[in-house]
């Protein structure tokens, strides 16, 4: 698959989960199944603390979009987690109005495969080591840069380290919501705003 050609065809509004999986795979992240999602949630709770969506919520999201929760394994151990997904127009509106609940996610707000996204949401970034953190962040950057550059991309920081990491890769604080960060849409693939 030529990811740049596919990204150009999709005009920065990717509708295909397999494209997200292909970009994540370039950074050694794999789409997680239900068992691995439970493991990834435990990793996130251990690193971030309470306030992480339930395993069932994560599994429902993966079933809904197909490629939203990824993990990096090193020597068999899960060392990195990336969870991100496209929002439909209703989800984008809820996010902008401060009504988006990331812990008790309503999958009706998430774009389905084939549905044009109104925004993209970075839901969880967690890693147990430097290599895991780097893979997760670089996959996140490339997913945005190649597939979702024409829509706003959001993430919420729950730790000071998370806030710094988001700002290093181009996120800026949201104008009205504390803790929410955004990358504005670009005019073309690979262009930063």
Where are these regions (language model features)?
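Acyl-donor binding region in acyl/amide transferases
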Residues: 95-170
């Amino acid at each position: 698959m030529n990811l740049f050609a596919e990204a150009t065809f999709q005009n920065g509004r990717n509708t295909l989960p397999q494209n997200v999986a292909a970009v994540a795979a370039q950074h050694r992240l794999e789409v997680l199944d239900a068992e691995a999602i439970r493991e990834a949630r435990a990793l996130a709770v251990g690193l971030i603390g309470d306030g992480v969506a339930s395993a069932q919520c994560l599994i429902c999201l993966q079933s809904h979009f197909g490629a939203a929760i990824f993990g990096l394994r090193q020597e068999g151990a899960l060392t990195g987690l990336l969870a991100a997904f496209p929002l439909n127009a209703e989800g984008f509106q809820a996010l902008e109005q401060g009504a988006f609940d990331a812990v008790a996610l309503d999958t009706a707000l998430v774009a389905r495969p084939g549905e044009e996204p109104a925004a993209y949401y970075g839901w969880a970034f967690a890693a147990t080591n430097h290599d895991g953190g780097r893979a997760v962040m670089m996959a996140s950057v490339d997913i945005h840069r190649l597939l979702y550059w024409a829509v706003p991309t959001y993430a919420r920081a729950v730790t000071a380290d998370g806030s710094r990491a988001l700002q290093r890769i181009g996120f800026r604080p949201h104008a009205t919501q504390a803790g929410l960060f955004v990358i504005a849409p670009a005019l073309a693939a690979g262009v930063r705003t």
